[in-house]
Amino acid sequence: MASGKEIRTKIKSVQNTRKITKAMEMVAASKMRKAQDRMRAARPYADKIRRLAANLSQANVTDYKHPFLVRKDQVKRVGLILVTTDKGLCGGLNTNVQRVAVNAMKEWEAAGATEIRACCIGNKGFGFMQRIGAKVVSHVTQLGDTPHLEKLIGPVKVMLDAFQNGELDAVYVAYTRFINTMKQEPQLEQLLPLTGEKLGTPDNSWDYLYEPDPQVVIDELLVRYVEALVYQAVAENMASEQSARMVAMKAASDNAKNVIGELQLVYNKTRQAAITKELSEIVGGAAAV
């Protein structure tokens, strides 16, 4: 059995750890609320631009059809945008979305895909893709607590340009969708080509007046729409990250509290045994006299 001093040292160590996890839990709770606000604030923009894109995709613009709307007969070259976190200590958040990405890559290869290109958003996903030997064509890390579209556009544009130039047949995005504080789900969604289901039903049957040119308007709008989809995925992932971290740190704090209680019980038993032994020695010595 460990001595009383050793047990006290362990108790002190666990108490210090609990202080850290408790502080991280409180910080994550604060960041979670801000991340949820950013996520909700991005939704109206994405929804509005989606409706505009739906209307324009059905409008009468001569015979022009944007490459983002053209579906390929065979999908041989696939692009994957993997959204993860920069930091750990958030439970199985990254592991789950990475598993979804790997399973999807295996399915694409089984279906006849000859090339898979990856764009990684977040340090954890970037490191993971490098470890498994995936072809990473672009990445961005260290986004901080507030994602800025300017930092995302560059790496994402690599994938969009590849699709537009015919180098890719489809582009998918894998991220963690925020459901609520206690639940987050890994998602894999098709980004390109844009589908009718993704765009939704047009609001009306009337056409637009285009200035200066309809093709220019549609080109810019659809690119902005896809960028908005990626930004929304990143915002959802960040809200999920802070929620998962808060839950993980709370579990760690609760476990530390239980360990402290168990160690305190062992310490009390050890101390009681030492006192009993000392009293027995005193009584034995007195009897001998």
From Swiss-Prot:
Its main location: membrane. Keywords: ATP synthesis, Cell inner membrane, Cell membrane, CF(1), Hydrogen ion transport, Ion transport, Membrane, Transport. It is a peripheral membrane protein. Gene3D superfamilies: 3.40.1380.10, ATP synthase, gamma subunit, helix hairpin domain. It comes from the Bacteria. One of its GO terms (cellular component) is plasma membrane. Pfam families: ATP-synt. PROSITE patterns: ATPASE_GAMMA. InterPro entries: ATP_synth_F1_ATPase_gsu, ATP_synth_F1_gsu, ATP_synth_F1_gsu_CS. One of its GO terms (molecular function) is ATP binding. It is found in: Cell inner membrane. GO terms for biological process: proton motive force-driven plasma membrane ATP synthesis. HAMAP family: ATP_synth_gamma_bact. F-type ATPases have 2 components, CF(1) - the catalytic core - and CF(0) - the membrane proton channel. CF(1) has five subunits: alpha(3), beta(3), gamma(1), delta(1), epsilon(1). CF(0) has three main subunits: a, b and c. Produces ATP from ADP in the presence of a proton gradient across the membrane. The gamma chain is believed to be important in regulating ATPase activity and the flow of protons through the CF(0) complex. Belongs to the ATPase gamma chain family. This is ATP synthase gamma chain. The lineage of its organism: Bacteria, Pseudomonadati, Pseudomonadota, Betaproteobacteria, Rhodocyclales. The gene is atpG.
